[in-house]
Swiss-Prot record:
Name of the protein this chain belongs to: Chorismate mutase
Organism phylogeny: Eukaryota, Fungi, Dikarya, Ascomycota, Pezizomycotina
Major localization listed first in the record, in broad terms: cytoplasm
Induction notes from the record: Induced by aromatic amino acids and chorismate.
Enzyme Commission code(s) on record: 5.4.99.5
């Protein structure tokens, strides 16, 4: 919810140096949230509708909690920020705080990939990184369902912010060469647009930096150097998530945003 990019200054918000700084900070945020999450087992029960009885709701425990959390957060303006996208838009309420007057930064668009993020995170990623304690789920009386869900929400919102930041990159690229991108958009050449915003060297730097961070943050710094210790999270799984999911999905967001860039705004 915090932002190193000043959304009150449209020029600064679209400065690639400042965007890059924010993306690097989000690597830290995501890494720490994931390390917190893997203290707990997968706890599949919380994602299964009907597995936990909730009065007047057919949602899973996790979705119910997430809905309520975003409802509360909307009251304090979280989703007024141009870089925040709710997983449950129907939960968003009118803020109790006076509105912040953000300038126009992004072109109007409908690009939101939160459903893809949540599905991948719950169904693909968590089973790879959550610890196996060698026992069955012991149920709501003994498992940390609330703490697990709280960690999940933090992870998912940070991932959403990281991935949707691609819109700011795309808008910055468009403004740097509108004639070039207009031709590609009019030709509906998604492949060429994707190639124009891809930098393999930068992607490698991101993955190398992320690996170092996960390895570093996943250890106890108080132990003597050279002392063997287990790392708190599966480093390869986190790096793979970025390589095979976060980076490609960010690129998809960038391309689809640009495909809507020429649509007249009302």
């Amino acid at each position: 919810m915090d932002s190193a990019v000043d959304m009150a200054d449209s020029e600064r918000a679209l400065n690639l140096t400042h965007i890059r700084f924010q993306l690097i900070r989000l690597e830290d945020t995501i890494t720490f949230h994931l390390i917190e999450r893997v203290q707990f087992p997968y706890n599949k029960t919380i994602y299964t509708p009907g597995a936990i009885s909730i009065p007047d709701s057919k949602l899973s425990f996790f979705d119910w909690y997430f809905f309520q959390q975003e409802k509360l957060q909307s009251l304090i303006r979280r989703f007024e920020s141009p870089d925040e996208y709710p997983y449950f838009p129907e939960a968003v309420q009118k803020p109790i705080l006076k509105p912040l007057n953000y300038p126009k930064i992004l072109h109007n668009n409908t690009v939101c990939v939160n459903d893809k993020i949540k599905k991948f995170y719950i169904e693909k990623f968590l089973p790879k990184v959550c610890p196996d304690f060698g026992r069955e789920d012991r149920g709501e009386a003994q498992e940390n369902y609330g703490s697990t869900s709280t960690c999940d929400i933090a992870c998912l919102q940070a991932l959403s912010r990281r991935i949707h930041f691609g819109k700011f990159v795309a808008e910055s690229k468009f403004q740097s060469d509108p004639e070039y991108y207009t031709k590609l958009i009019q030709a509906e050449d998604r492949e060429a647009i994707g190639e124009s915003i891809t930098n393999a060297a930068v992607e490698k730097q991101v993955l190398d930096r992320l690996r170092l961070k996960v390895e570093t943050y996943g250890k106890d710094p108080s132990l003597l150097e050279g002392v063997e210790q287990p790392i708190k999270i599966n480093v390869d799984a986190v790096v793979s998530m970025y390589k095979d999911f976060v980076i490609p999905l960010t690129k998809e967001v960038e391309v689809e945003y640009l495909m809507q860039r020429l649509i007249p705004e009302e």
